[in-house]
C-alpha cells in the first residue's frame, strides 16, 4: 500500500489543509498517511511564510530529501502552503528535485498535478487563487477523536503592514453557510463533539445563505452550529479585534457551547505601533471588547499574539505592552520578534533597535506569560472542571486524558471504573476534580455522580 508523509508548519489552517491533502490522496489514489518519511511514496511540505525562520526550515528539510530522492527516484516531493504561494517556480529552481508546487487554494488539484508530473517528467506549479473552489472538490473528512477543525473561510483582506497572508492566501472568501453546517453535521455523525471554526480572520465570515441574497455573519453561523446534534463545544481561531461585533459579544451570554476561552490577537499595546502595523483598532477599543466579554463571562480565559521589536518600538512602547499583559492576565500566547517579510510595507521601515534588545524584551514577555500560565493552573487546583475526554493518558494507559475549556491537558484516574467503562468515556464530557498542577498539564480524579 502506498503512503503519504506530510510535514506541517504554522497555523491551524495549515493543520486543516494537511488533513485535506491526505484525504484527497486517499480518496483518489488510496494513499495512507505515515509518520515515517523513509517509507513514504509521496512527501509533502505544507509551509508557512509568516516568519523567515519557518521559511528557511522548509528549504533545509528539502535539502535532506535530495538524498532520499536519489535512492527512490519514483518518490514524489511536493511543497504547498504559503511559501509555495510566495516563491512559486523559484522553489523548483532552488530544489530541482521538487515535483509539485501548489498553494493553499489548489491542494484539491494534487492528484492531477502528480499525474501530470509523472506523465510529462516536468515539475508542476499551480499557485493560483480559484477562490473557494477547493471545498467543492474535497472528499468527506475522515476524523479520529472527538475534536475537529472546520475551515469556514479563506484569505485575508486586512493587509496589516507586516503580514504576507493576503499575498499568499488571497482575499477573504467565505464558504456558503449550508456547506459549513453540512460539514459540521457530518463530523458530529462520526463522533466529533468539539469543532474549531477556522479562518485567517474567522469572525469576518460572511457566508451566502442558499439561493437567497441573504448573508450570514459569524455570530449567526455559531448559533446554527450550536444547534447541530452531538456538538457540545465550539471554538474558533483566529479572530480579529476589528471584526468583533456586538452580536458576537452578546452570544457569550446565551450560547453555553462557546468555550470560556478566546484567542484574540492584539499584537501590541502602543497605539503608535498599532497604527504603524495597520491593525485598524486602538488599545482602548481592544480592551473594551475584553471588558464586555468579562461582564458576561467573568472568568473568561484570554490568549493572544504579540510582536516585539517592531520598527520604531521604544522602551516606553514595550512597557505599555507588559502593563497590558499584566492587566488582562493572558493565559498563553504566541510571541515573536518582528520578522520583515519581503513585499510588505513594514519591511521598508527603518529599524535601529539592536537584536539583543529585542531578544531581551521577548524573553521578559514570555517569562511573564509563563508566570501567568502557572498561576492560572495553580488556581484551578481544588476546582471541578468540565473535560472533553480524548483518550488514554500518554504515560499511563490505565488513566484518561482530556482538555478543559481553557485548553489545559488533564490526566485523571478512574478508581473503580472497569476498562470497558473507561473506553466508553472517550468523546464524552465529564467532571474532573483538579488535584495537582504541573508546568504543562493538570491532574485530577473523575467526579462520580451518585
Swiss-Prot record:
Subcellular location per UniProt equals: Cytoplasm
Q: Which SUPFAM superfamilies match?
A: Radical SAM enzymes
Q: Which residues form a coiled coil?
A: none
- Which positions does UniProt annotate for [4Fe-4S] cluster 1 binding? 11, 48, 82
The protein's matches in HAMAP family, at most eight in alphabetical order, are given as: tRNA_metthiotr_MiaB
Gene source species: Cupriavidus necator (strain ATCC 17699 / DSM 428 / KCTC 22496 / NCIMB 10442 / H16 / Stanier 337)
Q: Name one GO molecular function term.
A: N6-isopentenyladenosine methylthiotransferase activity
The name on file for this protein is tRNA-2-methylthio-N(6)-dimethylallyladenosine synthase
The signal sequence is none
Q: Which reaction does it catalyse?
A: N(6)-dimethylallyladenosine(37) in tRNA + (sulfur carrier)-SH + AH2 + 2 S-adenosyl-L-methionine = 2-methylsulfanyl-N(6)-dimethylallyladenosine(37) in tRNA + (sulfur carrier)-H + 5'-deoxyadenosine + L-methionine + A + S-adenosyl-L-homocysteine + 2 H(+)
Amino acid at each position: 500500500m502506498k503512503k503519504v508523509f506530510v510535514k506541517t508548519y504554522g497555523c491551524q489552517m495549515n493543520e486543516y489543509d494537511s488533513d485535506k491533502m491526505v484525504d484527497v490522496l486517499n480518496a483518489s489514489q488510496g494513499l495512507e498517511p505515515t509518520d515515517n518519511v523513509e517509507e513514504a511514496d509521496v512527501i509533502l511540505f505544507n509551509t508557512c511564510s509568516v516568519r523567515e525562520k519557518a521559511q528557511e526550515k522548509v528549504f533545509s528539510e528539502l535539502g535532506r530529501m535530495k538524498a532520499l530522492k536519489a535512492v527512490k527516484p519514483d518518490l514524489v516531493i511536493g511543497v504547498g502552503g504559503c511559501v509555495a504561494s510566495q516563491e512559486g517556480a523559484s522553489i523548483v529552481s532552488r530544489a530541482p528535485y521538487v515535483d509539485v508546487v501548489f498553494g493553499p487554494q489548489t491542494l484539491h488539484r494534487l492528484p492531477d498535478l502528480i499525474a501530470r508530473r509523472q506523465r510529462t517528467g516536468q515539475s508542476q506549479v499551480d499557485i493560483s487563487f480559484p477562490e473557494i473552489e477547493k471545498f467543492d472538490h474535497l472528499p468527506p473528512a475522515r476524523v479520529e477523536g472527538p475534536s475537529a477543525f472546520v475551515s469556514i473561510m479563506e484569505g485575508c483582506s486586512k493587509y496589516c503592514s507586516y503580514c504576507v497572508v493576503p499575498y499568499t492566501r488571497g482575499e477573504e472568501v467565505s464558504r456558503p453557510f449550508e456547506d459549513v453546517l453540512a460539514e459540521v453535521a457530518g463530523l458530529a455523525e462520526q463522533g466529533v463533539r468539539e469543532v474549531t471554526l477556522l479562518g485567517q480572520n474567522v469572525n469576518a465570515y460572511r457566508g451566502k445563505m442558499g439561493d437567497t441574497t441573504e448573508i450570514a455573519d459569524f455570530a449567526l453561523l455559531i448559533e446554527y452550529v450550536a444547534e447541530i446534534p452531538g456538538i457540545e463545544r465550539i471554538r474558533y481561531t483566529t479572530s480579529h479585534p476589528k471584526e468583533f461585533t456586538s452580536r458576537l459579544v452578546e452570544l457569550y451570554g446565551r450560547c453555553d457551547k462557546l468555550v470560556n476561552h478566546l484567542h484574540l490577537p492584539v499584537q501590541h499595546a502602543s497605539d503608535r505601533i498599532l497604527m504603524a502595523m495597520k491593525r485598524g483598532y486602538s488599545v482602548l477599543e481592544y480592551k473594551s471588547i475584553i471588558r464586555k466579554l468579562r461582564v458576561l463571562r467573568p472568568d473568561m480565559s484570554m490568549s493572544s499574539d504579540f510582536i516585539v521589536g517592531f520598527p520604531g518600538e521604544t522602551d516606553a512602547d514595550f512597557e505599555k505592552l507588559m502593563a497590558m499583559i499584566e492587566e488582562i492576565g493572558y493565559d498563553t500566547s504566541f510571541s515573536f520578534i518582528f520578522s520583515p517579510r519581503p513585499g510588505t510595507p513594514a519591511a521598508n521601515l527603518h529599524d535601529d533597535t539592536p537584536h539583543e534588545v529585542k531578544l531581551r524584551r521577548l524573553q521578559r514577555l514570555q517569562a511573564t506569560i509563563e508566570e501567568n500560565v502557572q498561576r492560572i493552573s495553580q488556581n484551578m487546583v481544588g476546582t471541578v472542571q468540565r473535560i472533553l475526554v480524548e483518550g488514554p493518558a500518554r504515560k499511563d494507559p490505565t488513566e484518561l486524558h482530556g482538555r478543559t475549556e481553557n485548553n489545559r491537558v488533564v490526566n485523571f484516574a478512574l478508581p473503580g471504573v472497569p476498562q470497558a467503562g473507561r473506553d466508553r468515556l472517550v468523546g464524552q464530557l465529564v467532571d474532573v476534580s483538579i488535584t495537582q498542577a504541573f508546568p504543562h498539564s493538570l491532574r485530577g480524579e473523575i467526579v462520580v455522580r451518585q
